[in-house]
């Protein structure tokens, strides 16, 4: 299996996605026309830029092979290639979900299973 791709969701958004079986996107995703995903080594930057100090977040891991041809790798922050999904995010492709805890500094702590 290829390295997982990750999506950060609020608990509420995850509950709704689980009810539907898929996630259609956040306001930013809908504005940009695709679902923003990250690789493990991109998560710290994504969390710092878009979710600084925000609690109640979950980290979802997905198998990129199960997301299909609508998963594209495109330049984004600093020219790095990021995974962008041009389709609903199917929860059937989810490998696992874990809470993102906030440390005392206000920075998020990634789950131990991630080797970023």
Predicted features, each with a name:
Residues 1-116:
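Conserved, structured core segments of small domains
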């Amino acid at each position: 299996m290829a390295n997982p791709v990750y999506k950060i969701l609020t608990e509420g958004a995850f509950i709704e996605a689980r009810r539907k079986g898929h996630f259609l996107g956040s306001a930013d995703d809908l504005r940009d026309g695709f679902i923003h995903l990250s690789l493990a080594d991109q998560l710290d930057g994504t969390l710092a830029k878009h979710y600084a100090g925000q609690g109640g977040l979950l980290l979802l891991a997905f198998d990129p092979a199960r997301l299909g041809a609508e998963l594209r790798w495109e330049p984004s922050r600093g020219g790095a290639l990021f995974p962008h999904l041009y389709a609903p995010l199917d929860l059937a492709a989810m490998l696992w979900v874990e809470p993102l805890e906030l440390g005392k500094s206000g920075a998020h702590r990634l789950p131990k299973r991630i080797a970023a």
